[in-house]
Amino acid sequence: MRRWWLAALCALVLLFGAAGAEAAEVLQVRSGTLLQVGDHNRTYTVELACVAIPEGGNPAATEWLRAALPRRTKVNLRPVGNDGGTLVARVQRLGSADAAIGSDLGSGLIAAGLASPKPSC
């Protein structure tokens, strides 16, 4: 009986965990933490989750993100919240042979020394 409950719980976690991921296409990199993405006939402003950039922005972070996410790049969004109408999500690049694909772009900015992790994450 216990194994059955454990199997059912694992199945639910896998089912709902996968439902949180949505593929989208990058339309524009607005700043070091803000993207404009499209999903069929809708567009979203997406803020990278768990990443902090100094007030006034960081031009090097914006350029890094533009190089990592050219227009029409497919991305996977893992929503973590909403901030005044802006979707806050972990963003992963999809569909390329590049070694950095699949890694969280916020973590990439932090590893490059262009951003710092938010204390709340």
Over which residues does each language-model region extend?
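Small beta-barrel nucleic-acid-binding modules, primarily SNase/OB-fold domains
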Residues: 2-6, 17-121
